[in-house]
Structure formats: structure tokens, C-alpha cells
């Protein structure tokens, strides 16, 4: 199972949607086409922790009407870390629009 699919699986991560998926994978520097089983244990722990943390941040930012200010990769053109152009494709079984940096996000 790809990490981009696992994050959108509501039985695994209830409430996580496409924006959170893109932002969490960028925060932990994991390529969306990485298989969950290929993640090192440390990255798997980061995935779970960041999905939870970002979900709470997301809700607070949404309530304050400042959500878009906090997007680092979702609907952006350049990576905020390296300045390279972000990749955009419809990935996973759900074919959801996915943004990522091919330089900063590692495929395991």
C-alpha cells in the first residue's frame, strides 16, 4: 500500500484528506509513492505523529481562516526548502491530486 493511499484510508487515518496528505508527506520528507512496508520504523512513527499533529493544526487554521497560509506544497509551484519546481500527479488508487518535491522527499 502506498503511503498516499494509507493516509487517505479513513479506517486508518479518520479525517485525513488530500491537503493533509500532501502536507504531512512533505513535513516528513517522504515521497508519496513509497510503500508503507518500505518505510523505516522512525519514518512510520513520524507519519502517524504528523498526521495527528497536522490534523489538529489544520482544524485550528481553518477556524481562524488562515489555512492556505500554512500550505507548504499543496497547490504550490515551488518547494519552500530547495526552490525546485514541485511535482504534480494524480497518484494512488484514488487518483488524488498530489504535490511533492522530487528532491526533498525520499522514496524508500
PLM-predicted stretches and their roles:
Residues 1-108:
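Basic, nucleic-acid-binding surfaces and adjacent catalytic neighborhoods in DNA/RNA-processing proteins
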Amino acid at each position: 500500500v502506498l503511503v498516499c493511499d494509507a493516509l487517505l484510508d479513513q479506517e486508518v487515518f479518520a479525517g485525513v484528506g488530500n491537503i493533509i496528505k500532501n502536507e504531512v508527506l512533505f513535513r516528513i520528507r517522504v515521497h508519496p509513492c513509497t510503500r508503507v512496508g518500505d518505510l523505516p520504523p522512525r519514518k512510520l512513527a513520524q507519519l502517524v505523529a504528523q498526521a495527528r499533529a497536522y490534523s489538529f493544526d489544520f482544524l485550528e487554521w481553518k477556524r481562524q481562516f488562515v489555512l492556505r497560509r500554512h500550505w507548504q506544497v499543496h497547490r504550490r509551484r515551488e518547494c519552500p526548502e530547495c526552490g525546485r519546481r514541485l511535482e504534480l500527479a494524480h497518484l494512488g488508487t484514488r487518483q488524488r491530486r498530489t504535490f511533492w518535491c522530487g528532491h526533498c522527499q525520499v522514496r524508500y
